[in-house]
Amino acid sequence: IDFLYVGSNSLDFEIPGTLGIIQHHSITESKPRHYPLYHFSDIDFIDSDDKSFLVCNHMDNVFDQIRALKNCTLIVYSDQSHGIHNQRRFITELMNQNILNPVIIRRTYKGLSKEEFLMHSSVDVGGLQIDGLGDGVWLDFESDRSYVNQTSFGILQASRTRISKTEYISCPSCGRTLFDLQETTAKIRKRTDHLKGIKIGIMGCIVNGPGE
């Protein structure tokens, strides 16, 4: 995680590593790596010299004002079910106008199971990331945060935006596999899951395996 949003709260402990803290602009503290968050209605209060974050809807016309805010990161959200198209159009317009501010893609999901959340977010966010659109991900979901984080990093990894873990590519197994492929894959994972950025192919076929 690069940034942690705490809303109007404060942290009473030392920030670990290089983690940045995002707070609502009305209470942002003058501490290292603390950054204010604004909404589009508050854009006139943004100091162009300070690093900041701006939440905007795909329908907000930020293009003229954002030119002067070179240190501002845009958090672009859509509350529509097919928001991927709206966010794509918004980011494309930024590129057409040569606006180079970083963009975080934000989506919120409610009333879904974990599996549905995984599928929806992978399509909505991954569909943009795979085309090189967006610099970060912000997912909101009614579930444990560890699962949301795991899903976020999985999308970033699958789109080759950020490599954070070992990747395993295994054949689906068939009658030509003479050993327990799932058990073998589990053993390999146990020994190698610390090798960040490595791709490991696991072949079980006695015909194609040796050649590949």
Located regions from the model:
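Catalytic alpha/beta core domains of metabolic enzymes, predominantly
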Residues: P36-I43, S48-I202
